[in-house]
Amino acid sequence: MNFSESERLQQLSNEYILGGVNSPSRSYKAVGGGAPVVMKEGHGAYLYDVDGNKFIDYLQAYGPIITGHAHPHITKAIQEQAAKGVLFGTPTELEIEFSKKLRDAIPSLEKIRFVNSGTEAVMTTIRVARAYTKRNKIIKFAGSYHGHSDLVLVAAGSGPSQLGSPDSAGVPESVAREVITVPFNDINAYKEAIEFWGDEIAAVLVEPIVGNFGMVMPQPGFLEEVNEISHNNGTLVIYDEVITAFRFHYGAAQDLLGVIPDLTAFGKIVGGGLPIGGYGGRQDIMEQVAPLGPAYQAGTMAGNPLSMKAGIALLEVLEQDGVYEKLDSLGQQLEEGLLKLIEKHNITATINRIYGSLTLYFTDEKVTHYDQVEHSDGEAFGKFFKLMLNQGINLAPSKFEAWFLTTEHTEEDIQQTLKAADYAFSQMK
């Protein structure tokens, strides 16, 4: 493929935009470098770049675009609302309608508040949990990404009894001292952290199904034990469902798994492609939030009518019969096809799939925790990424990310993807 216009625009971008991208995950640094492809438009399962190349898209904006690009029903809703006004700074009926649809789908959201991103949603749930418990420390799991606020950019200490250290420049040591990081799926490490820190722990922050070091399921009983241990300690359980809400079924992962948290953060999919975030949970906890309580959260754009209208339209598409069955079927076809090709070409790789989402890891062991992904073969992934890109298959440029299917992918897309993977694997020996 020819990428000359993307390369020209990237050089121009570097003159004005720091690093040439507005999010570091969009650069190709993790896959060997080079100018990232500059996209021009998207329709359904496909993206089209500035050089006229067409791609089958499995990036899907890192997860939000579950109904494909420019879905007619959502696009129409956005256009209709834009003609009426996009921001009023007042309550609207759309906020009420959208909140009701969300609570009908996710019953644990007894009360809801909207923000503008997943980062804001998680950041605020932590503040609310601290206000409710009157404690300061939180526990998070290694490898899970919860946005870029200071408190969650903290790396693990040497063990469950050790405090974390800043995972980014600009995060104060004083902030990192409020965070304990333990391995996902390691209930003994979690018990040790709770036993050591006791009544200092306000909340534990959990991705019920991990989406940020690929797709990783909790081990049987893990989430149930986290709930029990936490509540026995007076610690709140916060689920980060920014990726997982409405990804696997019409609702949240918590309902699919049958384990209910105290608070939930959500975003991505529910905005229909527009900026959104939100959080909710038990009424008695949520009543800590202003104007009813002392925990402050506000936002000029929070609950704006454009995002509310897009979210309502998105849920109207997803609540139709057969949507998630199709995603699961396509995911199964893609997984089975890739596994056959891995065997055919004797590639050291494994796959985690959860319904219509999967991750291909270049490692010889089944992935259940972050360290396995950290030590997987990033060089092999980078080569695979470039070989697929040059055949019109758009993946996330990182070994840690997932492939996302949409309602608009077809069996023909799967077959074309497998054909490209067959060639890519053949060039990796």
From Swiss-Prot:
Belongs to the class-III pyridoxal-phosphate-dependent aminotransferase family. HemL subfamily. The gene is hemL2. One of its GO terms (molecular function) is glutamate-1-semialdehyde 2,1-aminomutase activity. It comes from Staphylococcus aureus (strain MSSA476). This is Glutamate-1-semialdehyde 2,1-aminomutase 2. Homodimer. CDD domains: OAT_like. The modification N6-(pyridoxal phosphate)lysine is found at residue 268. It is found in: Cytoplasm.
